[in-house]
Amino acid sequence: MQEIFLCSISNVRSGDCKEDCAYCTQSSHHQGAIKRYKFKDEKVVLQEARALRQLGALGFCLVTSGRELDDEKCEYIAKLAKAINQEELGLHLIACCGRADLEQLEFLRDAGIHSYNHNLETSQNFFPKICSTHTWEERFITCENALRAGLGLCSGGIFGLNESWEDRIEMLRALASLSPHTTPINFFIKNPVLPIDAETLSADEALECVLLAKEFLPNARLMVAGGREVVFKDNDKKEAKLFEYGINAVVLGDYLTTKGKAPKKDIEKLLSYGLTMATSCH
């Protein structure tokens, strides 16, 4: 039976990001109807970690909005990491806090963070069409810094931004050069507050994207993330094919600003596909 790794997300700082990423409702350039707060209370984060671990999640990603890490964010994430690790839940802790230099990432590593998530999002060529406030090259350098710091690298992208198949290939080729241990695969879902006018990918095209990712990243943990619940809706037959085509990790529960599938029902569905849930991070 195929084993699936479950990962969960905690949006520990939400909204008011000064970047203009066209796909993101957390950008202050778009008037998204989202919750905005500076730092989530530590007790709430610990409750989330315990609850999701009890459901079977092994990965727990602490996400902050904004362009980059700064001293305040570093201290906050380090404090959360130490508190969660003291619980001895056996969680693999991931931080996702934007651009970061080597020293900052080494600080997080020493505080108990195991991996750093920083997505390339799309190809180098297409990126300027979806963001003007920072460059694709900055993203790539942060990924390199994570590896240099001795952290695991989690890096992937978004399909369905009106990019071409060549853009998809270029992104995956760049990801392959980084050898991430995990690659999140997101599917863009149209939102009226966002400037991207793109129709949701069909389930068949989404599956083709997964096959392509598997071809370029045969050894990475391919994690289906945002958009799965919309692209595949109630199409169990095609959703099950995700795992035949190379997906071996799933985001359990909610995303940053959108609802995911109800965790217990999602796990029941995954089990009905003949999958088993991983019990170890390795």
Curated annotation (Swiss-Prot):
GO terms for molecular function: 2 iron, 2 sulfur cluster binding; 4 iron, 4 sulfur cluster binding; biotin synthase activity; iron ion binding. It catalyses: (4R,5S)-dethiobiotin + (sulfur carrier)-SH + 2 reduced [2Fe-2S]-[ferredoxin] + 2 S-adenosyl-L-methionine = (sulfur carrier)-H + biotin + 2 5'-deoxyadenosine + 2 L-methionine + 2 oxidized [2Fe-2S]-[ferredoxin]. It comes from the Bacteria. Residues 1-228 form the Radical SAM core domain. Belongs to the radical SAM superfamily. Biotin synthase family. Catalyzes the conversion of dethiobiotin (DTB) to biotin by the insertion of a sulfur atom into dethiobiotin via a radical-based mechanism. Homodimer. This is Biotin synthase. It comes from Helicobacter pylori (strain ATCC 700392 / 26695). The lineage of its organism: Bacteria, Pseudomonadati, Campylobacterota, Epsilonproteobacteria, Campylobacterales.
